[in-house]
Amino acid sequence: MSQEKNIDDWRIRIDEIDRELVRLFNERTQCAIEIGHIKKRLGLEIYSPTRERQVIANVTSLNKGPLDAEAVKRLFERVIDEARRIERVHSEAAAQVVTDIQAEIENTFINE
């Protein structure tokens, strides 16, 4: 029974860490969304390979194990891919809002 309790304790700890990871992933994603808005205003591309390489280099240099550098790289490549996708979605949604507002303004003036 004590070994089962030990496993349960570790699983509880993993669940706590998972909750924190989800919170941090969402916080990171919100930052990416804000960056996407800024890029849109400045006319910059969403995809920034130089920055993505910097992020990968940063996180792999921080790694002390037991994950190896390749595992950390793969994890963050996925995180970055998802952030880029969300940036793009939000950027397109913002562009659609602007288009809708412009159309509404034009319709208002045409109908007056």
Name what the model sees in each region.
Residues 1-112:
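Domain-level signature for soluble enzymes in the chorismate/prephenate branch of the shikimate pathway
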